[in-house]
Structure formats: structure tokens, C-alpha cells
Amino acid sequence: MEFDYIIIGAGSAGNVLATRLTEDSDVTVLLLEAGGPDYRFDFRTQMPAALAYPLQGKRYNWAYETEPEPYMNNRRMECGRGKGLGGSSLINGMCYIRGNAMDLDNWAQQPGLERWTYLDCLPYYRKSETRDIGANDYHGGDGPVSITTCKPGNNPLFAAMIEAGVQAGYPRTDDLNGYQQEGFGPMDRFVTPKGRRSSTARGYLDTAKQRPNLKIITHATTDRILFENKRAVGVAYLHGASNTPQEVHARREVLLCAGAIASPQILQRSGVGNAELLKQFDIPVVHDLPGVGENLQDHLEMYLQYECKEPVSLYPALKWWNQPKIGAEWLFNGTGIGASNHFEGGGFIRSREEFAWPNIQYHFLPVAINYNGSNAVEAHGFQCHVGSMRSPSRGHVRIKSRDPHQHPAILFNYMSHEQDWQEFRDAIRITRQIINQPALDKFRGREISPGIDCQTDEQLDEFVRNHAETAYHPCGTCKMGSDEMAVVDDEGRVHGLEGLRVVDASIMPLIITGNLNATTIMIGEKIADNIRGRTPLPRSTASYFVAGDRPVRGEPLRP
């Protein structure tokens, strides 16, 4: 079989490319996905409130584990990644957060990335989005991905937690993806008007899969990329349970969109990466590229949990006898508790003056439970997810064998810098000040976790070591740039090779301030225009907030 383009990975970026490239009817595209379909009747992936379920199994989750993390009491930590049409947009928390404008302006200051400023990228965020309250300078109204905004009548804890953040002296913002990210406000979410998860399989592939010039093969595990000299010419993949590779060929390009864990792994198996590593596994070196699999970054977060004095939390919804009614309302009406991810309030703040833009993120949740659905507190409660945004810690992804079914060695090196510890100590102490504000007086019960006895730097550090978890935002392992550790250029083209691009979160040179999915989709949209030889969308002229010399916070209502 031969196609113009072969896309490896039907995830947040791969589905964007498959859809945009097949808009040109004379172009043929093959989309290979190692997982299966996104079954529309499976509530585990389609119901927003069920977001913890896919992380508990392996049907939709690669369920990677890290090597023992040396600064986290040698814990092996979860690294869930999506498997199936939609990729990680099929199993993520559905928070529609783009990051801060300064993240992209910061990328664009690096040599070779001048066309990645916020104003260059904003048109591509808008192109991908249909926001339920309509378009404006920051938001789209006719894109493939449905975005739902918060509505009146949602859980009263959201408004109370946002108000508490403002009472603690921080700004209020009405749109975390608009003029000003900094502050506390409502969070948009990847949910359709009918209350379904808005993955890229639903938003993009539902349109594209009707086209005769797109072929999708699921249960297709990529073994390696095929090369002739320095040119990528095809892909060898394993279909279903077969161990016999099938080869397909690309007339124009191979587009690697397998994500921050699998993309470097596939490159390494294919002979592209650090030559010393490849030689350990007798892999013929196609191109010695030392940055492949390096520069791994993530967001680490922890939960501060509180009992709730008013019976308004989601605790009753965790009981099996209440779930049939919730499920029926969601299934037939697309409304009710099932139709939300329940991350409807949050914020971004600067913990210290030295940060030019926010370095701490909050998600508020009106129940006390682990992200993966474990360890639910048997009482009405609420929690703040809080974590640092741009850790200086760096890790790596490295193959352990040539076997495409064997997971790679993943090490994030979480908390390897003093800055990490300072940010988390600050975050816990600031969160306690926020929770102590008058807006939460009628809701706030005792602190369940970490517990009021946890006060000294040493006690806080030990809590973080034992309890902090991934926010599931790995990136950076095939970074864009022009330095010796860069893997791709500003259009995703792999340095030193022809006919091969990487287009996914692995090309982010620096992690962004917030959840990754919206920006990964934007990357797909932007590079799709490069691949098609189209003139980039005109730069936006929208204004955006820069803190400058403004203080980090004002006077709290209650110290």
C-alpha cells in the first residue's frame, strides 16, 4: 500500500492532521492507531463525569510507569497515556486550558522559533474551537472541537472557591483563555452541547472518516519508520495479534504523532536518536540525534482536601445506588452530574515576584477523591488540585528493547531542583490562606489532607514526596529548536532527515502554564498549514495581559 502521507497515532494532533490534509481531495492519507475505536456507547470515555474510569484499565490507557523517582522516595509513578482513536483526548480531564500567552512568546525568543508567538498561534486556537457562547477575539465559533463554558446553577462550591481566591488578594478573571489568564475564574471544558466528551476523534475524525482519501487502521502498533538513506519512506507496523510486520509506503511524508512517550520511542527503534543508546540494542543508526527522548517535562500536582459542612459535594454521586439515575439523565438528556468533568473553577497565580507570569495552577473539585478514582473520602468534601507549572526538572524516555510492545524507561526526575520544593511549600501555604477566606466559611470543615499538623518545611516536603502525583502532562521529548539537543525545526521537520515530521506535545520546547490538550491541537492545526504549503493564518491583533511590575497579590481580606 502507498499513500501520500502516513500518520502514526490518532491522538490530539494526529487527528487534526488527518482531517486537514484530507481536505485536499487529491491527497491520500493513512492513519495508524495502536488502540481501538472510541466506542460511543462506552460511558467510561464518553461521560465527562466518568473521567477516572479509563485510567483504571488498559483498554484506553497505555498505563506506563516511571522508573523509581529518586526525589520522590523512589516511587514508581503513574504515567497514563491515551490508547485508541482520540489518544489522550479520549481519557483526559477535559479541561480546556491553553496556557499563558507568555509561554508562546517565550518559545518564540529561541532561535528558529520566531513564528511561534502567542499572536501567531491564537488564530489556530480559534480555528480549532466552537465555544458554546460564541466567538470573539480569543475564541472560535465554527471549529471542530466543542467547548462548554460554566453555566449558572452549577455547584456552589465553585463560586465560593473562586471568590475565596479573590478575597485572598489575587485577581479575578472571567476567561482563563482570554485577555488575562492570571487570577481565579471559571474553567471551560472539552464537552459537547449534548454533554459528551469532545475528543479529537469526535470533533475531527467524525468529519474526515467519511472521505475516500482517508484510511484508518486501528490496532496497528508501529514497529519502526522505514528509511532510504536519510529519507523516511514508510512504516512497518504490527496488526492485531500478529508478530509479522506489514509495510506501507509514503510518497511525501511520515508524520509521527504518537505523543511525548511513544514518539521518541518509535524514533529510537527506527535508528534515530542517541547513537550510544541505539548501539546497545544493535539498532542501525540512521541519524545520530542526541535530543530524542531527552528534555522530558510534566506537571506534578497534589490535592489539599477538606470536609464540607454543607451537603453540596458530589459525595452522594459516588454511591452505586445513585448512579443509574445520573447515568440515565446523561444518556437520554445529556444533562446533569454526568455531563460535567467537575473541574469548573480554577486559577493561575504567581507565588513570588520573580515569576513574570503564573507558576502555580489550581483546579477546584467539589468532592474529595484521587484523580484516578481511588481513595474517595467517605464524607462530603472538596479539594484543591495545586501544582507548579514550569519546573526546571528534566527527565528522559529511552527504549529498553527493540520490541514495540515493551514500554520504555521513563524518568521524570520530579522535584530535582530546589525551586520545585520552594514552589510546593508556597503552594500549600497559599492554598490554606485561600481556603481560610470568608467565602468558604459555611462550607469549610477540617483539613483532611495533608492535615493541620503538617506545617514545617520538612513536613510539607515529606507530604509532597509521598503524595504528589502526575497531572498527566508529559511533553518536550522531541523539542523544537535549533540547538544541539533540538529534534525538530519550527515546522516539525526532524533535523538531518527528509520526509519525516513529529507533530505532538513532544515538540514543545518548554512546558506551558496549564493543561496540554488545547495547545497540542493548536500545534496540529498550525503545522497542517505548513505541510499543505498554505500561507499561515494572519497574526491576531488581540491584546493580552502582561503582569509587568504589578504585585503578585493584594491585601487578603483575612490574613
UniProtKB/Swiss-Prot annotation:
Query: Which residues are catalytic?
Result: H473
MF GO annotations: betaine-aldehyde dehydrogenase (NAD+) activity; choline dehydrogenase activity; flavin adenine dinucleotide binding
The entry's keywords? FAD, Flavoprotein, NAD, Oxidoreductase
The UniProt entry's GO CC annotations, sorted and at most eight, read: membrane
What is this protein identified as?
Oxygen-dependent choline dehydrogenase
Q: Which Pfam families match?
A: GMC_oxred_C, GMC_oxred_N
By its UniProt entry, which InterPro entries does this protein fall under? BetA, FAD/NAD-bd_sf, GMC_OxRdtase, GMC_OxRdtase_N, GMC_OxRtase_C
**What does the function comment of this entry state?**
Involved in the biosynthesis of the osmoprotectant glycine betaine. Catalyzes the oxidation of choline to betaine aldehyde and betaine aldehyde to glycine betaine at the same rate.
Record-listed E.C. numbers = 1.1.99.1, 1.2.1.8
Class in the EC hierarchy, top level: oxidoreductase
State the reactions this protein catalyses.
choline + A = betaine aldehyde + AH2; betaine aldehyde + NAD(+) + H2O = glycine betaine + NADH + 2 H(+)
- Where is the signal peptide, in residue numbers? none
Which biological process, per GO, is one annotated for this protein?
glycine betaine biosynthetic process from choline
Q: Please list the residues that bind FAD.
A: 4-33
Homology family: Belongs to the GMC oxidoreductase family.
Superkingdom of this protein's organism: Bacteria
Which cofactor is essential here?
FAD
Quick one: which pathway? Amine and polyamine biosynthesis; betaine biosynthesis via choline pathway; betaine aldehyde from choline (cytochrome c reductase route): step 1/1
